[in-house]
């Protein structure tokens, strides 16, 4: 599984994303520039320039027409992918930590930071696809403020039909909101309860690729969790030995990929084994760790799995994107119980 190394960012990666077809990779970093790459060979297609601060998040709509970026420069920008033109810029009161399109492309959520005396929010914008895409509303159609009894929201995403917004919080809780009214529905603690770690901030939420009926979370408490979207029930816990920054679910195979590592200031040497800078593969059902992939020389900040399940991309603190395509041994791997079940099914047929 030889990786393709994508070099184009001058500073640490903050997020990587595939489009729905999987032929493009979108990446953002602390260098204020977004990049678009061909996933087949790692060639850079172009850049999106206009931010003046760290870009924390990027998302692309389901039709690869528009993408959105959220930045520390207090703006959200909407881009026309074909030309690289910025068609809209929204000013926000605080840095924007996460952006995500709804499944039907009609809305965009943005998580803003709780700093400078401002309350953190989840803001929802209606997206207009008419004409040249520049006729966007200047204000959000919905603002969900952080509840007085809750810690700030760090990440958020949409349920399968866009009816709900699932948010991860600084204290390890996940919450569920009605995406039309902003009504709070329920919350549950999923991190900060599995070990003695005091810091339990949720760093990533990604949805199941097949039906979005459950999410995988990553947290600074050195764990990742599988959580049911309908009930917020904790389904599985994957325990690691370093803070986790990102987690993703693979289609085809029942695996979860985790990424993270010790922060640079806490690592006494630059060896990747010391900092635990590997992508970790766990069996989704049996929760066993089944392998690691090395390569980065700093924590992994973002992992995205190819929509077809044929590979994954990781963005690191070292400023590199590593694109891996799985070989035959990956697809052939089975636990004994899986092999036995398959044999029984074949004999019954």
Swiss-Prot record:
Primary location class: cytoplasm
GO molecular function per UniProt: RNA binding; translation initiation factor activity
Coiled-coil intervals: none
Protein's UniProt keywords contain Repeat: yes
SUPFAM superfamilies: WD40 repeat-like (SSF50978)
Record flagged with keyword Nucleotidyltransferase: no
Gene Ontology CC: one annotated term: eukaryotic translation initiation factor 3 complex, eIF3m
Keywords linked to the UniProt accession: Cytoplasm, Initiation factor, Protein biosynthesis, Repeat, WD repeat
InterPro entries: eIF3i, WD40/YVTN_repeat-like_dom_sf, WD40_repeat_dom_sf, WD40_rpt
Any one of the GO BP annotations: formation of cytoplasmic translation initiation complex
WD repeat windows: 8-49, 51-91, 93-135, 148-187, 197-239, 295-336
Domain of life: Eukaryota
Similarity comment text for this entry: Belongs to the eIF-3 subunit I family.
Subunit architecture: Component of the eukaryotic translation initiation factor 3 (eIF-3) complex.
Role according to the record: Component of the eukaryotic translation initiation factor 3 (eIF-3) complex, which is involved in protein synthesis of a specialized repertoire of mRNAs and, together with other initiation factors, stimulates binding of mRNA and methionyl-tRNAi to the 40S ribosome. The eIF-3 complex specifically targets and initiates translation of a subset of mRNAs involved in cell proliferation.
HAMAP family: eIF3i
The protein's name in its UniProt record: Eukaryotic translation initiation factor 3 subunit I
Species name: Debaryomyces hansenii (strain ATCC 36239 / CBS 767 / BCRC 21394 / JCM 1990 / NBRC 0083 / IGC 2968)
Organism lineage string: Eukaryota, Fungi, Dikarya, Ascomycota, Saccharomycotina
Gene behind this protein: TIF34
């Amino acid at each position: 599984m030889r990786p393709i190394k994508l070099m184009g960012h001058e500073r640490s990666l903050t997020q990587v994303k595939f489009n729905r077809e999987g032929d493009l990779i979108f990446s953002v970093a602390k260098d204020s520039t977004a990049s678009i790459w061909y996933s087949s060979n790692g060639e850079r297609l172009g850049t999106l320039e206009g931010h003046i601060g760290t870009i924390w998040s990027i998302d692309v709509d389901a039709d690869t027409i528009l993408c959105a970026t959220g930045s520390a420069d207090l703006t959200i920008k909407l881009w026309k992918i074909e030309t690289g033109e910025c068609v809209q810029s929204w000013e926000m009161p605080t840095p924007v930590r996460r952006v995500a399109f709804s499944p039907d492309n009609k809305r965009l959520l943005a998580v803003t930071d709780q700093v400078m005396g401002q309350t953190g929010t989840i803001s929802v914008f209606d997206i207009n696809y008419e004409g040249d895409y520049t006729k966007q509303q200047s204000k959000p159609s919905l603002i969900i403020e952080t509840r007085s009894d809750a810690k700030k929201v760090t990440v958020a995403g949409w349920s399968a039909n866009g009816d709900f917004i699932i948010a991860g919080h600084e204290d390890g809780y996940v919450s569920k909101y009605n995406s039309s009214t902003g009504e709070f529905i329920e919350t549950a603690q999923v991190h900060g309860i599995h070990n003695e770690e005091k810091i339990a901030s949720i760093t990533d939420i990604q949805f199941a690729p097949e039906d979005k009926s459950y999410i995988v979370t990553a947290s600074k408490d050195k764990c990742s969790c599988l959580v049911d979207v309908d009930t917020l029930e904790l389904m599985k816990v994957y325990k690691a030995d370093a803070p986790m920054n990102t987690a993703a679910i693979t289609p085809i195979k029942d695996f979860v990929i985790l990424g993270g590592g010790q922060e640079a200031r806490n690592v006494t040497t630059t060896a990747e084994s010391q900092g635990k800078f590997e992508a970790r593969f766990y069996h989704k059902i049996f929760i066993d760790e089944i392998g690691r992939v090395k390569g980065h020389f700093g924590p992994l900040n973002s992992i995205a799995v190819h929509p077809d399940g044929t590979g994954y991309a990781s963005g690191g603190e070292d400023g590199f994107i590593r694109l891996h395509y799985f070989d035959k041994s990956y697809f052939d791997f089975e636990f004994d119980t899986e092999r036995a079940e398959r044999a029984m099914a074949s004999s019954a047929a």
